[in-house]
Curated annotation (Swiss-Prot):
SUPFAM superfamilies: Ribosomal protein L1 (SSF56808). PROSITE patterns: RIBOSOMAL_L1. This is Large ribosomal subunit protein uL1. The gene is rplA. One of its GO terms (molecular function) is tRNA binding. The keyword tRNA-binding applies. Part of the 50S ribosomal subunit. One of its GO terms (biological process) is regulation of translation. NCBIfam families: rplA_bact. Keywords: Repressor, Ribonucleoprotein, Ribosomal protein, RNA-binding, rRNA-binding, Translation regulation, tRNA-binding.
Length: 229
């Protein structure tokens, strides 16, 4: 965003004010002044200490209206599952050739799905995939024999999230071009899932802050009352 446009957006935003979710969505759409279809992101500050394994918040959620992004998917599997993966819409399908490509530095996909019987080989590239959030994981549904279901869910808008070292959770929840109602439904689905996953070991206030932002826009705070756990 150009300097003047960003300053104009800041001028329209009270950084101390918390908005109802519907109003926050309207505000973020109003102040986003870019010539492309900007992504809207949500950030939550959680009252957890991720240094403790029993306070790590991690999960997946199906956004009712998707993210608006075309997601590229690699399925790593043996030949018996390849046709099923292709039919489900996977962009790349294979086994040893993709392990080798990744070893050589290729990571040109958004999501990797794998069958359990190839995880031993895929472990060779865990140090490459892990830091990029691409390593398949049973908890997120990306290690499975039902590759067709996994591919279809990811393509339809299933996203994965995980708390970072500072106790924050970030996720894309749609595009500025979405209807406000669609964004509200996506955001509500995300918030409810994060609240549902509150660790029993977490003490004090769990949801400490919620904010929306779009590509290169200031953030807009969201009232927490309906989502406090």
């Amino acid at each position: 965003m150009a300097g003047k446009k960003y300053r104009d957006a800041v001028a329209k935003t009270d950084r101390f004010q918390e908005y109802d979710l519907v109003d926050a969505v309207e505000k973020i759409r109003e102040i986003t002044q870019v010539k492309f279809d900007a992504t809207i992101d949500i950030a939550m500050k959680l009252g957890v200490d991720p240094r403790h394994a029993d306070q790590v918040v991690r999960g997946t959620v199906m956004l009712p209206h998707g993210t608006g992004k075309t997601v590229s998917v690699l399925v790593v599997c043996k030949e018996a599952k390849a046709e099923e993966a292709v039919a489900a819409g996977a962009d790349f399908v294979g086994f040893e050739e993709y392990v080798e490509k990744i070893q050589n530095g290729w990571t040109g996909v958004d999501v990797i799905i794998a069958t359990p019987d190839v995880m031993g080989q895929l472990g060779k590239v865990a140090k490459i995939l892990g830091p990029r959030g691409l390593m398949p994981n049973p908890k997120s549904g990306t290690v499975t024999m039902d590759v067709a279901k996994a591919v279809k869910e990811v393509k339809a808008g299933k996203i994965e999230f995980r708390v970072d070292k500072a106790g924050n959770v970030h996720a894309p929840v749609g595009k500025v071009s979405f209807q406000s109602e669609q964004l509200v439904e996506n955001i509500t689905s995300f918030l409810k899932e994060v609240v549902r996953l509150k660790p029993s070991a977490a003490k004090g206030q769990y949801v400490q802050g919620i904010a929306l932002s779009s590509t290169m826009s200031p953030s807009v705070k969201v009232k927490r009352e309906k989502f406090v756990a």
